[in-house]
Design a protein with these regions (language model features):
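Basic, amphipathic alpha-helical recognition segments used for DNA target recognition
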Residues: 1-8, 39, 91, 97-161, ...
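Amphipathic alpha-helical coiled-coil/heptad-repeat segments
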Residues: 1-37, 157-220, 356-411
Length: 411
C-alpha cells in the first residue's frame, strides 16, 4: 500500500472515530471534537446533612423534600438543618426507580434511595443532566442502579468553550416550556374535576348544586342501576393458540390501553375478522369499565367497534341514555365502585355487582347537555396533551442531533 493511500485511510478512520454531534450551533461548527469519559470520572457525590423519614413529610412547609419517587416534590419540611445547599445545580438519581431530576434551589433529602450528583469540572451539572435524560438508565427490577449509571460513557465538549452551556440552555428552555404547558393541562383537569362535582348530585342527594338554566325547574334526578343504561357485556379473549385471530385492524382493549383521557382507539393487541367473530362485539361509543385487577376503576369510551378482555365490563347504551353521561358518571364514582371489590389478592367486581350499582340520572336532554359540556373540556385536555407530547418529541429529536452516541462512533 502506498503512503498516499495509507494516509487517506488514516484520515477516514480518524473522521469515523471523531466524536462530533450531527447538529452543532453555528459558533461551534469548527470547534474540536468532543471527548468521552465514564460518568464516574465527571461527577462527585453530595452527602446530605440528614435525611427526612417518610413519616415526617408534611403537606406544606418551608422547604421541599426530594426522594426517588416520580413526583418532583415528595413533601415538605420546616427543618433548616436538613437543607442541602450548593452554588451549582444538583442532579438527583433514584437508585431504585431511576427517576432523574435537577434541583436549582435548596432542598432536603427524603428517605434513603437517591444519589445526589454534581459535575466536577470537565462537564457541567446542567449538561450532564440533559445528557442523562437523552440516554437514561432504565429500571430492570427493584435493585440499585447507580453502578450502571456510574459506568455510562458520556461524550462532552470542552466546558470552557461554552458549547456545554449552550446545549444545556437550549434543552432547559424546552423543559421550561413543557413544564408550563403541563401546568396548563393540570389546571384544565382540576377545573373539570371541580365542575363534575358541581354538575352531579352529591351522595345521598337528588339534585346537583349546579344546573344549566333550562333544567333548573326540571325536578329531582331518578336513581337507576348501571344495567338500566343498556346491555352490560363482560369481555373475553380469543384463543391465543390461534395466531390467525390476532394482528388485524380491530382494537382489543385491555386495562393497559386505558389512559386518563376519555377515548380509546389504538390498542397494543388487535384482532382479525375471524378473531372478532369469537367474542361479543362492543359497539362504538360504549362505556368500558375495568372490574378486575390492580387498575380496577379505570373507565373509557371506544371510538370504534372493538372487543375487550375479561377484565372489562362494557355498557352499550340504549336510546334512553347517553353514553357520554354514563362515562362521566362512572368516572366520578369510580373509587366508590372499585371499593365494592373489598380487600382480596385480585380485586374483582362481577357483572351482577357492577350492573346493580345505582347512580342518580336526569332525563336524556340534561344527560346530553352535561356530556357535551364536559366533552368540550375533554377536547381541550386532549389537545393540550398532544401539544405537550409534540414538545417532548421535539426535544427527543433535538437531543439525538445534539449528542453524539459513543457506541456508534466507536464501531
Amino acid at each position: 500500500m502506498n503512503t498516499k493511500a495509507a494516509s487517506a485511510m488514516s484520515e477516514e478512520s480518524s473522521e469515523k472515530s471523531a466524536l462530533v454531534p450531527r447538529l452543532r450551533f453555528p459558533e461551534f461548527r469548527d470547534a474540536e471534537a468532543w471527548k468521552a469519559a465514564q460518568l464516574d470520572k465527571l461527577i462527585s457525590t453530595v452527602t446530605p446533612p440528614k435525611k427526612i423519614p417518610a413519616t415526617e413529610y408534611f403537606a406544606k412547609g418551608l422547604f421541599p423534600i426530594i426522594d426517588q419517587g416520580q413526583s418532583d416534590i415528595a413533601g415538605w419540611t420546616d427543618d433548616p438543618s436538613a437543607l442541602i445547599k450548593d452554588d451549582e445545580p444538583l442532579i438527583i438519581f433514584g437508585d431504585h426507580t431511576c427517576a432523574l431530576k435537577v434541583l436549582r434551589e435548596p432542598f432536603a433529602q427524603g428517605a434513603d434511595g437517591i444519589k445526589i450528583l454534581k459535575g466536577n469540572g470537565p462537564a457541567t451539572t446542567e449538561f450532564l443532566y440533559q445528557h442523562l435524560c437523552f440516554r437514561p438508565v432504565l429500571p430492570e427490577e427493584y435493585k440499585r442502579h447507580f453502578s450502571i449509571l456510574r459506568d455510562k460513557v458520556i461524550a462532552y465538549p470542552e466546558a470552557k468553550s461554552g458549547e456545554q452551556q449552550k446545549i444545556a440552555d437550549c434543552l432547559s428552555s424546552l423543559d421550561d416550556l413543557i413544564m408550563a404547558e403541563t401546568q396548563k393541562l393540570d389546571a384544565l383537569k382540576t377545573h373539570k374535576k371541580g365542575l363534575m362535582q358541581q354538575l352531579f348530585p352529591r351522595e345521598g342527594e337528588t339534585v346537583p348544586r349546579l344546573r344549566f338554566p333550562e333544567f333548573q325547574e326540571a325536578g329531582e334526578w331518578a336513581e337507576k342501576s348501571i344495567g338500566d343504561f343498556g346491555e352490560v357485556i363482560t369481555g373475553s379473549t380469543p384463543s391465543t393458540a390461534r395466531p390467525e385471530f390476532y394482528g388485524g385492524g380491530i382494537p382489543f382493549v385491555s386495562p393497559a390501553d386505558i389512559s386518563d383521557l376519555r377515548w380509546v382507539n389504538d390498542t397494543k393487541t388487535t384482532l382479525t375478522a375471524s378473531g372478532f367473530e369469537e367474542i361479543r362485539p362492543i359497539k362504538a361509543n360504549s362505556v368500558l369499565f375495568v372490574c378486575i385487577g390492580s387498575t380496577i376503576g379505570k373507565v373509557t369510551q371506544n371510538i370504534r367497534d372493538c372487543a375487550t378482555n375479561q377484565q372489562i365490563n362494557s355498557v352499550i347504551p340504549n336510546t334512553e341514555h347517553s353514553g357520554g353521561f354514563l362515562y362521566y358518571a362512572l368516572s366520578l364514582n369510580a373509587e366508590r365502585i372499585a371499593n365494592l371489590a373489598g380487600i382480596q389478592a385480585v380485586p374483582i367486581i362481577n357483572k351482577t355487582q357492577f350492573s346493580a350499582v345505582r347512580l342518580p340520572v336526569p332525563e336524556l336532554p340534561e344527560q346530553e347537555r352535561i356530556a357535551d359540556c364536559l366533552s368540550f373540556l375533554d377536547d381541550l385536555i386532549t389537545a393540550q396533551s398532544k401539544k405537550i407530547d409534540a414538545f417532548k418529541a421535539h426535544k427527543k429529536g433535538l437531543m439525538q442531533q445534539l449528542f453524539p452516541v459513543v457506541d456508534e462512533v466507536q464501531e
